């Protein structure tokens, strides 16, 4: 699958226009307070571009997974349809107002906001309430998504998408609105995601290594299958490594293993060999008898895990080997941790991979891409995120791209000629 470049907000005429921007403000909120505003700050360049060029912004986002009302439901006597206190975007309106240094209007019902939209003047900002307060946003029926999209599209003139994290979902705000308006532009965040993934999938600087970890082979089958035709090296870590180890006849103690995936692991290793992809698996391990932290976990001397022990991180010799592989590459894509990095005693492998990628990027011009989710969290925790070429904002979306799938929320945007 090739990823086609899309027209960006720089190609759109926004002066005197009302610009509908699908952002990703799905931020953690505790007791009405935002605990991490990274996603809000990430959307600022796109919003500021519209304001600077003399347009106004209508911001749309989801937050959490509220149940959602139907558009046909009667309006309650008090409040709005579908409202859930835990998922309101009202705290986000206050935070974005602080960050932009200007008042941000808030429409308490995203499907009853025409009066708010009509009052917008150039350089004004309006945030609509959580689009998932309506079930039609993520309905499996296209006609239901389209009905909601038509209402939202009527508020504005231009559609911009900056929500890569939900690009793998067909929804009223991701695919419905650009369909109604006949065009869609990528915001700066979305553009960066598309540009980096298109480079790594279509024309990466070589050699290219894929570092794949996490718990289950079954979660990464399609990714491995798709990437084997594109990469030069494959580095495997995390619990999934032990299904491969067992498939090769190694002793894995009581480490996690998907017994029903042993044949699949063998066939993936065979396919790698046929495609001249060199595969690296752990040669030593950090183990414990139970799945819990230990002051001094056992470090094995060999590739075999002793009976009664489970491997919970890669060992020092494996770390050295993986650092060396990353060091000889020009591009690296990382999806999934090397161990149970949430426990400090099993975080060395994951953090070492992050450091090798960060150092390679800063010193040797490595193109480093972190595929969202746990890997992005690990890169942040290790302090290396700032040193990477690109840390993806979408776990599910980046995984589907690496699996060779088309993302509906990207495909719908207008192609760059």
Swiss-Prot record:
Cofactor names: Mg(2+)
Residues that, per the record, bind AMP: 215-216, 220, 239, 311, 342
Record: residues binding ATP: 215, 220, 239, 311, 342, 374-375
E.C. number: 2.7.2.3
GO molecular function: ATP binding; metal ion binding; phosphoglycerate kinase activity
GO CC annotations on file: cytoplasm
Repeat is among the record's keywords: no
Cellular localisation: Cytoplasm
Pathway field: Carbohydrate degradation; glycolysis; pyruvate from D-glyceraldehyde 3-phosphate: step 2/5
Catalytic activity: (2R)-3-phosphoglycerate + ATP = (2R)-3-phospho-glyceroyl phosphate + ADP
Metal-binding found in the keyword field: yes
Keywords, ordered alphabetically: ATP-binding, Cytoplasm, Glycolysis, Kinase, Magnesium, Metal-binding, Nucleotide-binding, Transferase
Gene3D superfamilies in the record: Phosphoglycerate kinase, N-terminal domain
Binding of (2R)-3-phosphoglycerate, residues: 23-26, 39, 61-62, 64-65, 132, 168-169, 216
Positions annotated to bind CDP: 214, 219, 238, 336, 341
Subunit: Monomer.
Protein's name according to its UniProt entry: Phosphoglycerate kinase, cytosolic
Species whose genome carries this gene: Leishmania major
Gene from which the chain derives: PGKB
């Amino acid at each position: 699958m090739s990823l086609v470049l899309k027209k960006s907000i720089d190609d759109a005429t926004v002066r005197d226009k009302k610009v509908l921007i699908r952002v990703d403000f799905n931020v953690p909120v505790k007791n009405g307070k935002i605990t991490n505003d990274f996603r809000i700050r990430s959307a600022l360049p796109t919003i500021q571009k519209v304001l600077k060029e003399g347009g106004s912004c209508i911001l749309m986002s989801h937050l959490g997974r509220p149940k959602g009302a139907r558009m046909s439901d009667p309006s309650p006597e008090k409040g709005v349809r579908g409202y859930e206190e835990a998922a309101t975007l009202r705290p986000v309106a206050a935070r974005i107002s602080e960050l932009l240094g200007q008042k941000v209007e808030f429409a308490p019902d995203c499907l009853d906001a025409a009066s708010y939209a009509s009052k917008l003047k150039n350089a004004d900002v309006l945030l609509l309430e959580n689009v998932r307060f309506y079930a039609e946003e993520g309905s499996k029926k296209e006609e239901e998504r389209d009905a909601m999209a038509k209402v939202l599209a009527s508020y504005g003139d231009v559609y911009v998408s900056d929500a890569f994290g939900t690009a793998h979902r067909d929804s009223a705000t991701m695919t419905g609105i650009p369909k109604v308006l006949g065009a869609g532009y990528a915001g700066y965040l979305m553009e960066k995601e598309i540009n980096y993934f298109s480079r790594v999938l279509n024309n990466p600087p070589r050699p290219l290594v894929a570092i794949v970890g996490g718990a289950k082979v079954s979660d990464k089958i399609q990714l491995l299958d798709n990437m084997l035709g594109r990469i030069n090296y494959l580095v495997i870590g995390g619990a999934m490594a032990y299904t491969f180890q067992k498939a090769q006849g190694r002793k894995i103690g009581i480490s996690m293993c998907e017994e029903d995936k042993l044949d699949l692991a063998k066939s993936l290793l065979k396919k790698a060999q046929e495609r001249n992809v060199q595969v690296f698996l752990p040669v030593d391990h950090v183990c414990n008898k139970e799945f819990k932290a230990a002051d001094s976990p056992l470090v094995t001397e060999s590739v075999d895990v002793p009976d009664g022990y489970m491997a919970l991180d890669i060992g020092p010799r494996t770390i050295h080997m993986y650092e060396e592989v990353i060091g000889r590459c020009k591009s690296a894509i990382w999806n999934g941790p090397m161990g149970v990095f949430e426990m400090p005693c099993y975080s060395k492998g994951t953090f070492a991979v992050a450091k090798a990628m960060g150092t390679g990027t800063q010193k040797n011009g490595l193109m480093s891409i972190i595929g969202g989710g746990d890997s992005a969290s690990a890169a942040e925790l290790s302090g290396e995120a700032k040193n990477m070429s690109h840390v993806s904002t979408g776990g599910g979306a980046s995984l589907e791209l690496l699996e060779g799938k088309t993302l509906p929320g990207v495909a719908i945007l207008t192609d760059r000629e």
